[in-house]
C-alpha cells in the first residue's frame, strides 16, 4: 500500500484547517476567521483502499511579534523535515505576496533535500469566492513564484502541480487528494482504520474552548487567549482560560457570565454525553513572551 505524511503549509488565514477538515471528511482541526488559529500540528488521517495519508495542519507562517509567534513558525517549518509531500495553500482572492513566497520557499527548500520524495502541490484555495479572472491571475502568479525558486531545486519546481480548490464547497479537493496519494511512497498503515486524528483528548477539548472564544472575541483578544485542560476525571473536565490583562478577563467572562456560559454550552454540545465541563479564567501577564508559560501550555 501507499502511505505517508503530508504537510499543509501556508500563511495565516488561507484556509489550511478548513482544507484539512474537508480532506478527512470530519472536523479534526478548529477553524476561525482570526489569523493564527492553529497552534498545534494537528494530524488528520485519510483512509483509502490501498492508501493512508496523514495530513499535518501547521500554524500559519508569519513575521512573529512574540516568543509564541516564533515558536509557531518553528513548528510549521520543522514539520517539513518529516513529511513526504507538501501542500502549499494560497488564497485565490488575494495577490501572491511576500508571505506566500516565504511559504513556497520554505516548502521548496525542504523538498530539495536529498532524502525528500513526494514533492510540492500548490492548492489555490477559496475558489468559491474568486472571480474567474482573479483565479487565472492567482494561478499564474503561483506558477511564477514557484518557478523563481528553481535554482538548486529544479526537480521540485518542475514536478510541482497546481490545483484550484474550495475547502468550503469541496470543489477540486478530490483531485488534490488523488494527486497526494499518487505521490506517497510504499509503506505500512500508521494508524488503525477507525482513527481520524491523534490529537490528545485534553488538547482537543482545550482547542474547542478556544475556538468558541475566538468566535466571540473582540479584535484585540484572539492572540491573548490560551486554553489548557488542568484536570480530567471523567465526566469532570476542568479547563483554564488564560488572558494577559485583567480587562480581558471581564470580556471573556461577559456581563453576568454570558460569554463563558455560551462557550461552555457550545463546547459541551460537541463532547460525549454526560461531560461536565468547568471553565475558569485566569490572568497571566505576558504569557506569550514567557518561555516557561509556553512550555506549560505545550507551545
Write out the residue ranges for each language-model feature:
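Conserved G1/Walker A P-loop phosphate-binding module
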Residues: 1-85, 90, 242-243, 279-280
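Conserved glycine(s) of the Walker
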Residues: 15, 172, 259
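Conserved, well-folded catalytic cores of nucleic-acid-processing
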Residues: 26, 45, 49, 79-86, ...
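Catalytic P-loop NTPase motifs of RecA-like helicase/translocase cores
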Residues: 38, 62-63, 95-96, 130-131, ...
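Conserved Switch II/interswitch segment of TRAFAC-class P-loop GTPases
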Residues: 80-103, 115-136
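Amphipathic helical hotspot of TIR/SEFIR-family domains
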Residues: 98-110, 226-231
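P-loop NTP-binding site
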Residues: 201-299
